[in-house]
Amino acid sequence: KRASGPAQINIPRDFWTQVIDIELPKIVEFERPSGGKDALQHAADLLSEAKFPVILNGAGVVLSTGIPASAALAERLDAPVCCGYQHNDAFPGSHPLFAGPLGYNGSKAGMELISKADVVLALGTRLNPFSTLPGYGIDYWPKDAKIIQVDINADRIGLTKDVTVGIVGDAKKVAEELLSSLSDHAGEANRADRKAMIAKTKSAWAQELTSMDHEDDDPGTTWNERARSDKPDHMSPRMAWRAIQAAMPNNAIISSDIGNNCAIGNAYPSFEEGRKYLAPGLFGPCGYGFPAIAGAKIAQPNVPVIGFAGDGAFGISMNEMTAVGRGEWPAITMVIFRNYQWGAEKRNTHYGLQITLLELS
């Protein structure tokens, strides 16, 4: 078993026209590293002395089954836990220390809390740009904080942000090692004030998010305002996400596609366990949502699944329609945001009010 990533299988053409014998190679298990001794101790010392530690969980926490380990570390420190863009399943949503996702259309609570950090533990994340870019007018990345970055891939450490300590290792193992290496007084500095601030900040953001019905127009544009005036009885994407979130089963698996309609949803779904949020990430493959959720249902036929896509992205996935229509395939739920346009491209491609080739019939 190797690190998670895409795989390609090449099958010679003549193999499809005959019965063949194959021998499957034996699975080789690799022991994942838990980090270097000196780096771990340096990181543990920084966390032990931190006055406002913050943990940022990435996909590595999910892939390493490290969510319980990161929770134990967070609880020892009473550190708020954020997650990377579209990795909302990297920490239990009901946990009082969970501050939500960073990045595009993420959690303002998470952004405000990490901006106060003096030490950030970036656990199992490459710190990709979409997970650290400003949001809601807040340039929140704590430029003066000590950054501890943990990644199984050494090439990613320090790639996008300056780091104080880099640890090459499995996120779960590193979290466990750090917890066992903390000093007796770790987390004690400002603990009560920090816990109160986390609760207050989360509550304020939850109320604000509930009241956000529409997207604001970019300076110089009026797309959203005109869309609301044209169809005042239609739900906005934010209204739809709120309604879906309220009705969604707690154990559901969801998939997302690219585009603004789905990206708006970064602030809404939360999960109690990992491998519940399938998202295209920075690769940005248009048409990802439908086939991803179909695959999830085949793998987990007894778990409810919900896919999300805009009408443009969904239109790219018509091959999958022939597959899911087969009687032996389990049923899936697919939510289509219908705005009859390539909305993200239309929003960013204009001269005055003239738009070309971005409408869908």
Describe the role of every protein-language-model region:
Residues 202-302:
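Active-site diphosphate/adenylate-binding microenvironment
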Residues 1, 24-26, 65-78, 135-140, ...:
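Short, solvent-exposed amphipathic alpha-helical segments in soluble enzyme
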Residues 35, 42, 48-120, 246-291:
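Anionic-ligand anchoring segments at beta-strand to alpha-helix junctions in alpha/beta enzyme folds, i.e.
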Residues 87-206, 327:
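Glycine-rich, acidic loop regions that bind phosphate or pyrophosphate groups
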Residues 1-49, 210-227:
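Conformationally flexible catalytic loops at phosphate/diphosphate-handling active centers
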Residues 111-114, 160, 166-168, 172-176, ...:
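Thiamine diphosphate
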Residues 11-16, 59-61, 87, 154, ...:
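Glycine-rich beta-alpha junction loops
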Residues 10, 79-85, 148-151, 334-337:
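Short internal beta-strands
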